[in-house]
Amino acid sequence: VQHLLRDDPRVMQLSTIAAVAFLIYAPFGYIPALGDWLIAAVADQTSAALAASGYPVNFSAWNTMERNGFRTEIILACTGIQSIAIMLGVAWGVPSTARQKVAGFLLVFPTIYILNIARNVFVITAYSEQWFPYLPAIAGNGEFGYESFFWAHNVMAELGALIFLVALAYALFLILPELGTLADSLYRLYRGEVERVLRPKAPQSGLQP
C-alpha cells in the first residue's frame, strides 16, 4: 500500500493490469443478461463439441446438460472469462505497440476459449461416463457418481489449466518483453519486505561480546 500511495510506477503498472482485467470481466460478472448470454453460448458450443465427439447430451435446463442420468450445470466460471480477463489484463496493461496488443489478444482469447470448451467436454464426458470412480472416501460427497466429477474437474482439469496458463504466460513474455522487466522490478521491490517479515531482526540488548 505504501508504494501505491507514493505513486511508484511499478505498482501503478500492476494496478493498471488489475484494472484492465476487471473492466473485461465486470460486464459479464455484474450484468446478468451478458453473463447469461455467455453461459448459453458456451453451453451450446460445449454440447456441439460433445455431439461431435460421440457423446451427445440433452438439455434439462438452458444451461444444464444431462447424459446417462448425470447432470452438469454450466456457470460463469465454466466459460473461461476469468482467465481471459486476467491474461488480457496482463497483455494490455503494460506499455506496448498496437501490434503487440493485437498479438496478445490473438494468443490469449481464442486459445483460452477453445481449450475451455475442450475442458468442459472432458469433465462432462468423464462424469457422465463415470471414468474415475476412485477413492470415494476422499472424492465423494454422498452423491452417486460424484467421484468422477471430482477427479476430472477439481484435480485433472485444474492441474491442466495451471500448466497451460504457465505456458501461456511464457508465450506472452516472448511477445511482450516489457512483462519480464515489470516482473523483475516487482520482485526486487517486494523482496526486501518479504525478507523482513520472514526474518525479523533480533532485538539488541545493548551488550557487546
Predicted regions, residues:
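Hydrophobic N-terminal alpha-helices or hydrophobic patches in metabolic proteins across all domains
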Residues: V1-P209
